Regions:
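Beta1-alpha1 glycine-rich phosphate/pyrophosphate-binding loop at the start
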Residues: 1-71, 157-180
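Residue-level detector of alpha-helix initiation sites
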Residues: 10-13, 36, 107-109, 129, ...
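A Rossmann-like FAD-binding core segment of flavoenzymes
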Residues: 27-28, 72-89, 96, 163-260
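N-terminal Rossmann-like NAD(P) cofactor-binding module of classical short-chain dehydrogenase/reductase
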Residues: 102-103, 233
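Glycine-rich dinucleotide-binding loop and its adjacent helix/turn
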Residues: 105-163, 260
Length: 292
């Protein structure tokens, strides 16, 4: 049996661990990983800024892929799924046949469509490479802004504080973690965050990002106020990475996500989807816990 796995994040690797515990005759497993390193712990990604190395964050024991028929291809994402031929085309142009295909592409950061969002010094907070780029830029920066006041945004704000930057959080809603807490909880949370030395700006709609006068950037808000900063990190939520599924004609939800049944099968019985890219019973779980 040929199994191809697209994606090697936390849930993709958890699947491989489970698969490795079973004896399957004549099994070949090919894992296509977009990133330059095997799966690592994204949950504790912020610890990278307090000294945890990339190797220490790895979830893959040495020798894990030293199994007959198992292959990990780094920096080689899938670019096409040919369902009729049951083939996956990789970025290197290789065509891989499969008996079963597992899509574990996870999610991608949502970046608000703000003019100037692609300026140098603007980042997303998702991969170790993102963090390395932030760290390099932060060596000459004095201040940083996190766009997004959810849980991940607050974690990112801690990372900027750990880098020694004057840190701001800009949130569109009227309170931090607006989905998780009510107004009273939001007031308590805001006070706690400000007590940690982080400046909080709620109810702010960013219209554009332009050159600053005393800093690299100026963020212009809809209420005519503005904020200058040397670096900006977008942490405004995630979206399921389902582009391949859409291109191949698999069923996806109205707001994204590959539709799966209780066995994680997609609308094609030979293709499965797991993790943050999957939509089960109308729900997308934007966290790894259900996969564990």
């Amino acid at each position: 049996m040929n199994i191809v796995v697209i994606g090697h994040g936390m849930i993709g690797h958890k699947f491989l661990e489970a698969l490795s515990a079973h004896t399957v005759p004549d099994l070949t497993v090919t894992v296509l990983c977009e990133e330059p390193r095997p799966a690592y712990d994204r949950v504790h990604l912020s610890s990278f800024f307090s000294g945890t190395s990339a190797d220490a964050l790895s979830l893959v024991p040495e020798g894990f892929f030293d199994r007959p028929g198992w292959t990990l291809r780094l920096c080689e994402p899938a670019v096409e799924i040919d369902r009729e031929a049951r083939m996956v085309v990789t970025s290197a142009g290789d065509r891989l046949s499969y008996d079963r295909l597992v899509i574990a592409t996870g999610s991608v950061p949502f970046v608000p469509p703000v003019p100037g969002r692609d300026r140098s010094g603007c980042f997303v907070y998702r991969t170790i490479e993102d963090l390395q780029a932030m760290q390099a830029w932060g060596r000459t920066a004095r201040s940083g802004v996190v766009v997004g006041g959810g849980l991940l945004g607050l974690e990112c704000a801690k990372a900027l504080r750990d880098m020694g930057l004057e840190t701001h959080v800009v949130e569109f809603a009227g309170r931090l973690m607006a989905v998780q807490v009510d107004d009273g909880g939001g007031r308590v949370l805001r006070q706690r965050i400000e007590d940690l030395g982080v400046h909080v700006h709620t109810g702010k709609n960013t219209l554009e990002i332009v050159d600053g006068e005393s800093s690299t950037h100026r963020m212009q808000f809809a209420d005519d106020s503005w904020l200058e900063t040397d670096m900006i990190v977008f942490s405004a939520g995630i979206r399921p990475q389902d582009a391949l599924a859409r291109l191949s004609g698999l069923d996806v939800g109205p707001r994204g996500g590959i539709v799966v049944d209780d066995q994680c099968r997609s609308s094609d019985p030979d293709i499965y989807a797991i993790g943050e890219c999957a939509l089960w019973q109308g729900r997308i779980f934007g966290l790894v816990a259900p996969g564990y």
